[in-house]
Curated annotation (Swiss-Prot):
It is found in: Cytoplasm. Disulfide bonds: none annotated. The active site is at C93, H199, E201. Its EC number is 4.3.2.10, 3.5.1.2. It comes from the Bacteria. Heterodimer of HisH and HisF. This is Imidazole glycerol phosphate synthase subunit HisH.
Amino acid sequence: MSKLRVGIINYGVGNLGSVQNAFAFIQTHFSDVLPHTLEIKVESHPERLQDYDKLLLPGVGAFGNAMTHLKNTHLDEAIREFVQSGKFLIGICLGMQLLFEQSEEFGNHKGLGLIEGKVVGFEHIAPLKVPHIGWNSCNFTPEGKHSKLFRGIADGSFFYFVHSFHIQTQPQFILAQCTYGYPFGAIVHKDNLFAIQAHPEKSHNVGLRLLANFLTL
């Protein structure tokens, strides 16, 4: 069995421990799904990103601070080069939002610009509270119904969310929607990019299955 090198990008604001634990669990419990053995590393050196077969961009916190960290460490350009090479990358939570063109969180900030669209705050609709915290169902769009990312995952499965902002993008990029007051794009796909607003590493078996599916793409 060949080895798949997976890099977890460390730029100072990521939820690295829980993501590492999730991949360790996947390697042990989803071996029947994976066509490769896994070599998982946390990576903070931009010049080494191209050494990996797949990358995961995690993140918690504020969009502007995260982009500042990426720029100061030159990881922003390294991520763009990795994606341009055709290799697969998945962003989770804040990591998802960073893939887009801009965010309105605490001002206007430019993102990585890899997916067309922007990040906006939730509308305050009583009695719903912001941030959106907890379990919520994700419903497949027509674009997502046959996605390999969802193999073994039922339509309407529940994922764990913690966020105050969400993405707005073109419908053809949205694989699944979640509703919190109104529908928003929860899981997206463009070319070799995937992203999920929820925390798959905290979403029990369904989230781990999604990450395992990503590794098989």
